[in-house]
């Protein structure tokens, strides 16, 4: 039954995305938005004044960033009462007229972030107002990857781990070169401990998909990594998800995903 549901979802995604975007089209979209949207343009220009300090935490090199233009996001009140009082800035109806959306998957749009942490910062919100809950949209990540520039990485801040809009689901994306965890991954993996491996048969073209779960010891915080040679990594992720602690007052484990 689960395989039938997965097959139907994939068919829906194929139908919706017969004409997919390419990495070049996404870069052109960013360029056009920065040309016509003054707020995004000015805040991107301010990144030249960005201050970055290199330091070590538990022997791990860390970059600390000082970006005054991000003060609104980093100090945003995310308690239930505050969220209910403000209009959701990720809902299309509340976004400024200059902000445009690029249709990328069945449930997700792509937008330029007007308060970037680095140049080319993208926000990828759900088309419907639904809370941060990554299992709901995990199956669409693979299709999303295929439309982004090849040097981009997708990341996710959980509703209790830094998301400034926990009431509206969204991924984010930036160039991999700005993410120390990714640039340091090969070195970090040397301390990886295998936890589980899963094989799934996809179809006669793709064949068998292998996904492996690792625990990496030696990072500044607990770190799990999943490596997969196909799109079928979400089952292993959900098994990990089920083992992570969740507070009785919260709906998702405290996690960030890259």
What are these regions (language model features)?
Residues 3-140, 152, 158-159, 176-258:
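Active-site microenvironments that recognize anionic phosphate/pyrophosphate groups
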Residues 142-145:
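Short, well-ordered alpha-helical packing segments
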Residues 148-166:
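Active-site nucleotide-donor binding segment shared across nucleotidyl transfer reactions
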Residues 173:
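Phosphate-group recognition and catalysis centered on beta-loop-alpha active-site segments
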């Amino acid at each position: 039954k689960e395989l039938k549901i997965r097959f139907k979802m994939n068919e829906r995604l194929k139908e919706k995305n017969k004409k997919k975007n390419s990495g070049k089209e996404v870069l052109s979209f960013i360029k056009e938005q920065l040309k016509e949207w003054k707020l995004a343009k000015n805040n991107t220009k301010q990144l030249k004044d960005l201050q970055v300090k290199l330091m070590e935490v538990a022997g791990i090199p860390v970059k600390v960033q000082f970006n005054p233009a991000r003060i609104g996001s980093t100090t945003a009140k995310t308690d239930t009462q505050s969220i209910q009082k403000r209009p959701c800035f990720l809902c299309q109806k509340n976004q400024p007229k200059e902000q445009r959306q690029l249709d990328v998957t069945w449930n997700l749009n792509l937008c330029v972030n007007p308060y970037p942490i680095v140049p080319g910062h993208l926000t990828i919100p759900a088309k419907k107002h639904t809370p941060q809950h990554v299992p709901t949209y995990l199956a669409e990540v693979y299709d999303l990857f295929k439309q982004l520039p090849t040097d981009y990485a997708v990341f996710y801040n959980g509703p209790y781990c830094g998301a400034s809009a926990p009431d509206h689901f969204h991924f984010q994306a930036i160039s991999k070169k700005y993410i120390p965890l990714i640039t340091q991954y090969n070195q970090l993996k040397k301390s990886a401990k295998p936890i589980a491996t899963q094989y799934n048969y996809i179809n006669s073209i793709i064949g068998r998909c292998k996904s492996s779960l690792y625990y990496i010891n030696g990072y500044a915080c607990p770190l799990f990594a999943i490596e997969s040679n196909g799109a079928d990594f979400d089952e292993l992720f959900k098994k990990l998800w089920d083992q992570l602690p969740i507070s009785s007052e919260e709906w998702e484990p405290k996690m960030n995903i890259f």
